């Protein structure tokens, strides 16, 4: 590995803007804002969506398009409910 070409890896706190949930993880991002987390001071990265607020992970998914496709298939092939 070449020396001096890799970005610095550090621990940062990711905060979900929608829910306020905080996650500690490693990153090469260098934010200017800091936050106290579990007694330590870490750089803070604000994110709009995380696993705490994304519909796939919260179980609040909507399958609106799938219903339309099924109805179209049933109409095309004459299947009834």
Swiss-Prot record:
Name the record gives this protein: Large ribosomal subunit protein bL31B
Subunit comment: Part of the 50S ribosomal subunit.
Lineage of origin: Bacteria, Bacillati, Bacillota, Bacilli, Lactobacillales
Gene Ontology annotations of biological process type: translation
Keywords: Ribonucleoprotein, Ribosomal protein
PROSITE patterns to which the protein is assigned, alphabetical: RIBOSOMAL_L31
InterPro entries, per database record: Ribosomal_bL28/bL31-like_sf, Ribosomal_bL31, Ribosomal_bL31_B, Ribosomal_bL31_sf
Pfam families per record: Ribosomal_L31
Any one of the GO CC terms: ribosome
GO molecular function annotations of the record: structural constituent of ribosome
Coiled-coil regions listed in the entry: none
Family under the similarity heading: Belongs to the bacterial ribosomal protein bL31 family. Type B subfamily.
């Amino acid at each position: 590995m070449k020396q001096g070409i890799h970005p610095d890896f550090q621990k940062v706190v990711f905060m979900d803007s929608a829910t306020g949930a905080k996650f500690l993880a490693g990153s090469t991002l260098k934010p200017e804002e800091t936050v106290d987390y579990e007694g330590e001071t870490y750089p803070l990265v604000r994110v709009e969506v995380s696993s705490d607020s994304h519909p796939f992970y919260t179980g609040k998914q909507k399958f609106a398009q799938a219903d339309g496709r099924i109805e179209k298939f049933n109409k095309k092939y004459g299947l009834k409910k």
